[in-house]
Amino acid sequence: FGSGLKDLWKTVVSLRNKKSTVRYLISNMFYRDSLNGLYSFGGVYAALVLDWSIVQIGTFGIVAALAAAVCSWLGGKWDRRVGPKPVILLSIIVLTAVCVIVVGMSRVSFFGIPLAEGSSIPDNIFYGCGVLIGGFGGILQSASRTMMVRHTNTSNSTQYFGIYGLLGRATAFLAPALIA
């Protein structure tokens, strides 16, 4: 255990010379927590704001998971072609836009525009948002790993991915705390 902590400390100290890696790890820590917040609170939002049943929420989850599978595969091809940075940036932009849409929507209005009583527009929009969250969330996660690979070499990949995993957990409390 002690030697593992020594190795961890040496790796952390070695990051002083890798400013790009440090910036990436810090930004990844926050956007990964944001993505986890989106995943966690999608069902809560659907139940409390849109008054969805458990079956509708389950269907939403399945649709988002299927979108994640297909889009992650397509995103991998895109990542291979253009590299992870533009893939990560576009994914964050799309997911931010989805958050704006979700915040501007309720059962009775869309960005302040009243909807007819019983309108299915909020449901359809939220399903579309679920596809985008699942799809671009999957793309974001896979491109983030590709980016981490580019910040490592064969001699330090285990240590760097360990820090990557640790930092992903370090702020896991933020999204629930900020939303609550």
Region annotations inferred by a language model:
Residues 1-25:
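Juxtamembrane intracellular "pre-TM" segments in multi-pass secondary transporters
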Residues 40-57:
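Short amphipathic helix-loop junctions that connect adjacent transmembrane helices
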Residues 54-55, 154-164:
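Loop-to-transmembrane helix entry/capping segments in MFS-fold secondary transporters
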Residues 70-84, 110:
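Helix-to-loop junctions at the C-terminal end of transmembrane segments
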Residues 80-95:
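Cytoplasmic membrane-interface "Motif A"-like loop-to-helix N-cap segments
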Residues 114-139:
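Hydrophobic core of transmembrane alpha-helices in multi-pass small-molecule transporters
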Residues 139-153:
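Intracellular juxtamembrane helix-capping segments at the cytosolic ends
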